[in-house]
Design a protein with these regions (language model features):
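Positively charged, amphipathic and often flexible ligand-engagement surfaces
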Residues: 1-175
Length: 175
């Protein structure tokens, strides 16, 4: 069993090496809440290694329907500041609300997601402002189809006088 252990984050390391050969961007997606802390840990651990420390073509997704997304962003900002190289952060609202709610209830755990859409929307807008205020450490990318949320992001960018090209608006085609 021990011989099968390739070290923490070996799959991400492999992807980063291949991406570098092809000048490709890697964005680490976030899926279920029970894997969130592990995903963040591996992301930070791998990008803190000397081989990957210089990489600024890597990002991670933060789901703003999670109640602890704000504290995750603070920790990510503090880590990126210490690292000295910014990372991209794609803010999304989240797509697994039903699963996260049902899974937590079935296990008797606290529900990790906001229970009302307006709470998720409000948190998304709070986190837009946080990431934009910290754009020298967290490169903002906003993944949404919601016109109000995107308009809010553009208004905050204008208010904060964000430099051109310092943030992105992203969306899935076909939605």
């Amino acid at each position: 069993l021990y011989s099968q252990n390739r070290g923490e984050g070996w799959r991400l390391k492999t992807l980063l090496r291949v991406a570098a050969e092809h000048l490709a961007f890697i964005n680490v997606d976030m899926e279920s809440y029970d894997k969130k802390d592990l995903t963040l840990h591996i992301f930070k651990a791998v990008l803190s290694e000397p081989e990957f420390l210089h990489r600024d073509d890597v990002g991670i997704v933060i789901q703003c329907y999670l109640k602890d997304s704000g504290s995750d962003l603070i920790a990510l900002r503090d880590w990126a500041r210490q690292r000295g190289i910014p990372v991209w952060v794609r803010l999304v609202k989240g797509a697994y609300w039903d699963y996260e709610t049902a899974h937590a209830q079935a296990e008797g755990w606290p529900i990790p997601v906001y229970q009302h859409k307006w709470e998720s929307d409000a948190n998304y807008e709070r986190q837009i402002r946080f990431v934009m205020k910290n754009h020298q450490f967290l490169r903002p990318a906003f993944g949404s189809h919601n016109l109000r949320s995107l308009s809010h992001g553009l208004a905050v960018a204008e208010e904060l006088k964000m430099p051109p090209g310092s943030f992105e608006i992203q969306m899935l085609y076909g939605m």
